[in-house]
Amino acid sequence: MQKKLFLIIPILFFLKINEIKVISYNIRYNNSNDGINIWENRRSTIKNFIVSENPDFAGLQEVTYSQLIFLTESLKDYDFIGVGRDDGKNKGEFSPIFYNKNKYKVLSNDTFWLSSTPEKVSIGWDASMERICTYGLFENIDTKKRLWIFNTHFDHIGNHAREKSTD
């Protein structure tokens, strides 16, 4: 029995070390017409959820610049990668990837538009608006293991755009 226990403990330790927690969360854009569900009434709940889940990575959708500022200031253990979809900078919704900066560092990152011209701001196929994919190569600070994380938000109207966005 002692030999079996001795073998189980290192295996469990190994499994815990290699665990990565990733969440995806559509936080809904900051819309003043949302009545009781306006951003000011949701933001603490969203921040608290992310803190309580303590993910290594959080791919968020429909994030406006003002929401991004709040989350960046509120989530002290996290930094993010991503750009606004309307100009490749700060305008329009972001699909940011928040990452635990105490555990991971960014080696490279970029954004592409879900369209036939992915390198520039563009609306794809029958989509109702610009759609983007944010991605990054991350390295675990302790283990030096690397991984790619991608985050996107497909169009809610264009069937063809949703299909082509998977290519």
Can you annotate each of these PLM segments?
Residues 150-167:
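Active-site-proximal segments of metal-dependent phosphoesterases and phosphodiesterases across multiple
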Residues 30-34, 118-121, 158:
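A short acidic, helix-capping loop that chelates divalent metal ions and anchors anionic groups
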Residues 3-7, 13-74, 85-93, 166-167:
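N-terminal, active-site-proximal structural segment of metallo-dependent hydrolase catalytic domains
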Residues 8-9, 158:
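Intrinsically disordered, low-complexity segments enriched in polar/charged small residues
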Residues 36-41, 127-130, 160-164:
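Conserved phosphate-coordination/catalytic loops
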Residues 57-148, 154:
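Structured beta-strand-rich core segments of catalytic domains in phosphoester-bond hydrolases
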